[in-house]
Amino acid sequence: MSLILPLEKPALNLRPLLWLLLPLLALATLFFWPLSLIVEQALRGANGEIGLETFRQVVDSKRFVGALLNTLQIAFFATAGCLLLGSVMSLILVFIPFPGSELIGRVVDTFIALPTFLITLAFTFIYGSAGLLNGALMSLFAFELPPVDFLYSMQGVILAEITVFTPLVMRPLMAALRQIDKSQLEAASILGAHPLRVIGQVIFPAALPALMASGSLCLLLTTNEFGIVLFIGAKGVNTLPMMVYSKAILESDYTVACMIALINIVLSLGLFSLYRLAASRTGVRSQPC
């Protein structure tokens, strides 16, 4: 006579859920809860009711429209400059090695660790009204006023951001260029292909994922950059992060500041979504920078 033993149910393993719960709890505490407070403050009108009154007030403001246009203009031009300068420098350092190229590559890596205000301070010492360049020109040509004054304009902000964020393009791009099969370049050279054609048909497709990833990172960082604009003190250059600062700290208008911050968040997410869409259309997989 056979005995039928009851099947024991396996014990429920809660360890995977615990490992999932801990990061979710930290994320909710450090990110979603403060974000919900910003959203609530932004949507709460003067009468205490939730609505879009503050949103309409902000959007109708010429100051906000100007800050939005300045933010987009600085972000796009700075990103384009980073991609152009980073591509040229990466091609030279990888495919045209020269004495000291390794040292320059290490200096580029060091730039990533430097705070943005330090680069801006160096720009002030060099291109400022009392900087080295203006001092030398005024001494040589007896100018009464500093001849170089682009630093305190939008062009100065863009140039400073290009200097700060170009290493973020070069680092992944140089890694991608070093993985290109040199035999393909040698074959194209033997067949008499023009260097520009080699770049367009061999190098560019291999470098496209790195360019897309680093370009999107630069676009997001330049859109939300605050320290460079504040430290340079460019006249008439107001951006969304600067407007959030002035509304919250200088004017104590926290409702409007939260609404502008919320719009800035939506803008950043929108730009990132455009990058993801472009990457999917071109068949590029996102890579970490």
Swiss-Prot record:
GO cellular component: plasma membrane
Location, primary (coarse class): membrane
GO BP: 2-aminoethylphosphonate transport; transmembrane transport
CDD domains: TM_PBP2 (cd06261)
TM annotation in the entry: 19-39, 76-96, 111-131, 150-170, 202-222, 254-274
UniProt domain ABC transmembrane type-1: residue ranges: 68-275
Subcellular location: Cell inner membrane
Membrane topology: Multi-pass membrane protein
Keywords recorded for this protein, A-Z: Cell inner membrane, Cell membrane, Membrane, Transmembrane, Transmembrane helix, Transport
NCBIfam families reported in the protein's UniProt record: PhnU, PRK15050.1
Family the UniProt entry places it in: Belongs to the binding-protein-dependent transport system permease family.
Function: Probably part of the PhnSTUV complex (TC 3.A.1.11.5) involved in 2-aminoethylphosphonate import. Probably responsible for the translocation of the substrate across the membrane.
UniProt protein name: Putative 2-aminoethylphosphonate transport system permease protein PhnU
The species this protein was found in: Salmonella typhi
